[in-house]
Structures are given as C-alpha cells and as structure tokens.
C-alpha cells in the first residue's frame, strides 16, 4: 500500500460524505414537491 501520510484521501472523504448529503437534499426536495416538506 502507498503511504498517504496517514490521512484519508480527500476524494474518498468527499464521496462518503457527499452521497448522503445529496440523498438528503433529494429527499427534502421530493418531500416539498409532495407537500411533506412543510413539516420539516
């Protein structure tokens, strides 16, 4: 394995944290279009 100075690659952090954020935003917009966004 290549030594990355003990740090997690930035692209991996962005992917792991980005997918749930995009999912939550998608659910939020879907809920608002369905009329459920007002309850959040």
UniProtKB/Swiss-Prot annotation:
Q: Which SUPFAM superfamilies does the record match to this protein?
A: Photosystem II reaction center protein J, PsbJ (SSF161021)
Major place of residence: plastid
Gene Ontology cellular-component terms listed: chloroplast thylakoid membrane; photosystem II reaction center
Q: Which residues cross the membrane?
A: 8-28
List GO BP terms, alphabetically.
Answer: photosynthesis
Q: Check the record and name the InterPro entries matching this protein.
A: PSII_PsbJ (IPR002682), PSII_PsbJ_sf (IPR037267)
Similarity comment: family membership: Belongs to the PsbJ family.
**Protein name in the entry:** Photosystem II reaction center protein J
Q: Which organism is it from?
A: Musa acuminata (Banana)
């Amino acid at each position: 394995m290549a030594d990355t100075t003990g740090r997690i690659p930035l692209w991996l952090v962005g992917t792991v944290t980005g997918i749930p954020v995009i999912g939550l935003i998608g659910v939020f917009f879907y809920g608002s279009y369905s009329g459920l966004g007002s309850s959040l």
